[in-house]
Amino acid sequence: MKQNKRLMVMAGGTGGHVFPGLAVAKQLQEQGWEIRWLGTADRMEADLVPKHGIEIDFIKVKGLRGQGVKRLLAAPFQIINAIMQARAHMKRWQPDAVLGMGGYVSGPGGIAAWLSGIPVVLHEQNAVAGLTNQWLSKIAKKVFQAFPGAFPSAAVVGNPVREDVTQLDEPAQRMQEREGPIRILVMGGSQGARILNQTLPAVMANLGQDYCIRHQAGKGAAQEVQAAYQANNVANAEVTEFIDDVAQAYAWADLLVCRSGALTVSEVSAAGVGAIFIPFMHKDRQQALNADHLVECGAAKMIEQPDLTVESLTQQIQQLDRQALLSMAQKARSAAKLDADKVVAQAIVALTEKR
């Protein structure tokens, strides 16, 4: 017999889906809720979620974009099978609500919850809603969005961001007395970004000793990127595959050069760091739209990928002295929505109290 309320989180594929889900889960765990995850066995959630003390169930589901004719013809059967798998997990565990945070798993999981009479809560992290969330929004009891425009009438709450990021000191406390080389942090998301790996070593060669850099290269790319810095005679570069303590990295940085995935944009704002965004090219300009509000308020700069060259990025960085970077950081922090995890958690609690 159940003692506590239960939430099943549906999120997978990338850190942009998984980390916000973990932030909401933590809020509810602190209120005595039991949390279980629905994911896929071959994506990052399979390794990451159990490290946070949360048990995970798996279903077999893959994306359909870019697939051949045979895969597309088989897709309806695979989706039905995934829905049945998800429904079986829910029948066994009996959650009081499910939270869809995106990734391939959310579609079958959301439909399974709806068929089982379990309320669905959605959170869209990007400025352009994904196809799965567009469908699920029609059956969800509550829909949230991080940025305006994803849905016409959903509440804008920001993205749930990890507590260690939201609790960083204000930019002035961190940056006011800094001396020495300007600190550049490069992050291409949890998967890395090849164009940043290719461009930054030559940029650092142009910038010289007045700058130092920490570079997250992505899985399997650190050795190649380190060699590129060495080939450009850049001594003050630290290269890793993945940065484990992201909050500490934000606190260290004067400037971030990065993609503008939804979670990255929200973390940059919550941490209070000036940024130069290089959006991933996508037909709906999703990443560019994610970053627009920070660019418009003076907290960030943006270079669209077709315009990115060693020269254009070098020039943009050289225009930003420490005072300008502090101003950008303060504007970023002022634009942050720091309570998205609490707002979503409160909505889930309120929804289940009505049942």
From Swiss-Prot:
CC terms in the record's Gene Ontology section: plasma membrane
Pfam families linked to this entry: Glyco_tran_28_C, Glyco_transf_28
GO terms for biological process, alphabetical: carbohydrate metabolic process; cell division; cell wall organization; lipid glycosylation; peptidoglycan biosynthetic process; regulation of cell shape
Pathway the protein takes part in: Cell wall biogenesis; peptidoglycan biosynthesis
Binding-site residues for UDP-N-acetyl-alpha-D-glucosamine, renumbered to this chain: 14-16, 126, 162, 190, 243, 262-267, 287
Assigned keywords, A-Z: Cell cycle, Cell division, Cell inner membrane, Cell membrane, Cell shape, Cell wall biogenesis/degradation, Glycosyltransferase, Membrane, Peptidoglycan synthesis, Transferase
Function in brief: Cell wall formation. Catalyzes the transfer of a GlcNAc subunit on undecaprenyl-pyrophosphoryl-MurNAc-pentapeptide (lipid intermediate I) to form undecaprenyl-pyrophosphoryl-MurNAc-(pentapeptide)GlcNAc (lipid intermediate II).
The protein, known as: UDP-N-acetylglucosamine--N-acetylmuramyl-(pentapeptide) pyrophosphoryl-undecaprenol N-acetylglucosamine transferase
UniProt organism field: Vibrio parahaemolyticus serotype O3:K6 (strain RIMD 2210633)
Name of the gene encoding the protein in the UniProt record: murG
